[in-house]
């Protein structure tokens, strides 16, 4: 009955909008697809303030069912009736899964095939959408155990992706499906707690109801595993096959760590995969990539491809997900791909055509000195000296100026020691950090007034926390204590 009243109220409001704005309706209605495990797909318009009970009351009659016979699954969770649409992080043309509840006897058989400790239950936490319960994957286990309710709000998971459609760094949404049938009517037995849970296979089991016969992982009837993937949150969904590359090194700077290059404290940063977890802002990361690209200082890695390490020179710090380099411009990324291809040819014992404007990669026999650029410019050259092919010994190389590796991107060791994610404070940062306007040394403020004194030996600059300039009488009068 409550749904009928809400429906009438919504209809009246829409009519008033139509009369007031001459046909230009102002509405936040979401057009959503509802899929069943019997092959049906419905298109419904949902108001953000509606709850899941309203959705069931709208969908059930179209399926010839009662609302109590349905359950709604989204992003790995069975949603409770009290969950509202606006809590679910839905976008236009998102997909909800409406599954008919199985008879009690049938449900009992399915549940008995799963491990008792992994059996999902619809507790308050389990019935909330994944975006409401998932904590930031950068948090350590100890931080998760000791987190308070106030800290939990700030530590909700936030993801970044490179979207090929938007062609930029975008906010991302985590989604989940069955690893076997790729269906979205899948509920996880637990939330992911680290990036390995999300990026690696066979980490988190769950229950799949995408098909009329539930999926099982093996002949013993073990539950299937979840497959996580990401979508762009900044454009209309392209359906369940929509995908965006996750940039797992880019994070919200919840620890307020300064950039190791410019020392600014940015909201969004990249954390290198080294033991110290050095931090850089996105602009400085682009500058780092651009300068290394200009000098062809990217390195071939047997597992990760053409990549870069931490600029502080840390061991075991190569970037694994090369989609991070798509933060460069399109032209720069095309250049990166060309250099990567050329590097592969050279590593395989090949040569590059030296003719200006060509650069074709050529794989030739080890003892072959005369090389012809086939399928390219047709230039014939000497493999040893890369000059036009000749009879006899190669001419000695000229004494021209040799190339230098004077990189524009440099890292101060003192800054690198301060720009470490692993030594920053935990989830709530009650102590904020800003760089001294004179020497750029990060300075902490833990309450008190806005009059700051740089703690770096030899500096001692007095400055205003608000203005980030030299402390003056104006600062004293306007915001000494905030």
Swiss-Prot record:
Region (TRIAD supradomain): 255-482
Effect on the protein upon substituting residue 94 to A: Abolishes phosphorylation by Pink1 and reduces enzyme activity
Phosphothreonine PTM positions: 187
First-level EC class: transferase
Binding, Zn(2+) 5: 353, 358, 373, 377
Disruption outcome: Pupal lethal; large percentage fail to enclose. Escapers that develop into adults display various phenotypes that appear to be the result of mitochondrial abnormalities and/or mitochondrial dysfunction.
Residue ranges covered by zinc fingers (RING-type): 157-246, 259-314, 436-467
Positions contributing to Zn(2+) 6 binding: 382, 385, 390, 394
Tissue: In oocytes, accumulates in early egg chambers where it is enriched until stages 9-10, localizing mainly to the posterior pole and anterior margin (at protein level). After stage 10 it is no longer detected in the oocyte (at protein level). In embryos, ubiquitously expressed in the early stages (stages 2 to 5) (at protein level). Expression levels decrease at later stages and becomes restricted to the brain and nerve cord from stage 9 (at protein level). Relatively higher levels of expression in the head compared to the body. Enriched in the dorsomedial (DM) dopaminergic neurons.
Pathway assignment: Protein modification; protein ubiquitination
Residues at which Zn(2+) 2 binds: 178, 181, 208
EC number(s) on file: 2.3.2.31
Residues holding Zn(2+) 3: 259, 262, 281, 284
Domain called Ubiquitin-like: residue spans: 30-99
Residues the record lists as binding Zn(2+) 1: 163, 166, 232, 235
Zinc finger residue extent: IBR-type: 334-394, 432-473
Family (UniProt): Belongs to the RBR family. Parkin subfamily.
UniProt subunit comment: Forms an E3 ubiquitin ligase complex with E2 ubiquitin-conjugating enzymes. Interacts with Pink1. Interacts with Marf. Interacts with Paris. Interacts with septins Septin1 and pnut.
Protein name, per record: E3 ubiquitin-protein ligase parkin
Species of the source: Drosophila melanogaster
Gene that specifies this protein: park
């Amino acid at each position: 009955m409550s749904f009928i009243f809400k429906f009438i109220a919504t209809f009246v409001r829409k009519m008033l909008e139509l009369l007031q704005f001459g046909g230009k309706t102002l509405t936040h209605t979401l057009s959503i697809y509802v899929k069943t495990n019997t092959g049906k797909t419905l298109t419904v318009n949902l108001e953000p303030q509606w709850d899941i009970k309203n959705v069931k009351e709208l969908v059930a009659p179209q399926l010839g069912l009662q609302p109590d016979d349905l359950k709604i699954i989204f992003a790995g969770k069975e949603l409770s009736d009290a969950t509202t649409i606006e809590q679910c992080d839905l976008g236009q043309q998102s997909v909800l899964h409406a599954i008919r509840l199985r008879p009690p006897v049938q449900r009992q058989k399915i549940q008995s095939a799963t491990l008792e400790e992994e059996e999902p239950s619809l507790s308050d936490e389990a019935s909330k959408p994944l975006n409401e319960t998932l904590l930031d994957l950068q948090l350590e286990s100890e931080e998760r155990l000791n987190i308070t309710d106030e800290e939990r709000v700030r530590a909700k998971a936030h993801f970044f992706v490179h979207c090929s459609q938007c062609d930029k760094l975008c906010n991302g949404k985590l989604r989940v499906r069955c690893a076997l049938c790729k269906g979205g009517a899948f509920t996880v037995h637990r939330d992911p707690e680290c990036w390995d849970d999300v990026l690696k296979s066979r980490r988190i089991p769950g229950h799949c109801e995408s098909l009329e016969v539930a999926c099982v992982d093996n002949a013993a009837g073990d539950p299937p595993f979840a497959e996580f993937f990401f979508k762009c949150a900044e454009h209309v969904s392209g359906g369940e096959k929509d995908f965006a590359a996750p940039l797992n090194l880019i994070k919200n700077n919840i620890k307020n760590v300064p950039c190791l290059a410019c020392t600014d404290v940015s909201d969004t940063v990249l954390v290198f995969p080294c033991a110290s977890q050095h931090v850089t802002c996105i602009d400085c990361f682009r500058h780092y990539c651009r300068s290394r690209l200009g000098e062809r200082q990217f390195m071939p890695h047997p597992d990760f491809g053409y990549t870069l390490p931490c600029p502080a020179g840390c061991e075991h710090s190569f970037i694994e997900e090369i989609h991070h380099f798509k933060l460069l411009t399109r032209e720069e990324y095309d250049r990166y791909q060309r250099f990567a291809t050329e590097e592969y040819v050279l590593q395989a014992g090949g040569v590059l055509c030296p003719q200006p404007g060509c650069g074709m990669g050529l794989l030739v026999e080890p003892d072959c000195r005369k090389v012809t650029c086939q399928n390219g410019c047709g230039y014939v050259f000497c493999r040893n000296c890369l000059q036009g092919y000749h009879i006899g010994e190669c001419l000695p190389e000229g004494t021209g100026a040799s190339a230098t590796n004077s990189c524009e991107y440099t890292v101060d060791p003192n800054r690198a020691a301060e720009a470490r994610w692993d030594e920053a404070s935990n989830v709530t940062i009650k102590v904020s950090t800003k760089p001294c306007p004179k020497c750029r040394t990060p300075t902490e403020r833990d309450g008190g007034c806005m009059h700051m004194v740089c703690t770096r030996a030899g500096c001692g600059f007095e400055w205003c926390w608000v203005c980030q300039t030299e402390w003056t009488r104006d600062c004293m009068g306007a915001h000494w204590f905030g």
